[in-house]
Amino acid sequence: IAQMLCFLLGLLCGSINELNAFSPFAVAFVTAVSGKYTISAGLGAAAGYILTQDNLSALRYIAAIICSVILIRLTNELERLKKFRLLPSCISFMSLFLTSMAVLFADGTSVRSFFIFLSEATLGFALSFVFSSAFDALTVYSSQGGFTARDIVNVGALLSVVLLSLSEITVFSASPAR
């Protein structure tokens, strides 16, 4: 059930598409998910990107997901790096930034595009931190049976991103997620 839930959350995060090609949500989600759920979250995120993005953007984000999954798996083997709290955020930033720079240099460089890609990677860094904090809070909740105030904020941020992905769904011209 948890694998299916991670797949669906990855699919929802991959379907968030802001400004027609600004979607770091699923890459941040995949880097924040714990080890055994990484593959299902990555497959869901890739499916979300394929269903909602154009070919070049979907390919760029899928390359970032693959890079993130490989780096997360490699760093899980190194005990010293495994304990670094910002590791998922750094991997998310690096994956988004490097794939964006590859697209930028292939299409021709412009200052505006560079800053858009830099802001996307920075947003991916922040979102990955929020997602990993929310997953840590859910892990603590399941082991101790309660949330702290900080954990409630982290889980609330995760839920708001999920609602953002559902904001395009309308029922009688009203969006329940909004």
Residue ranges and their predicted role:
Residues 1-178:
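Short helix-perturbing small/polar motifs within transmembrane alpha-helices
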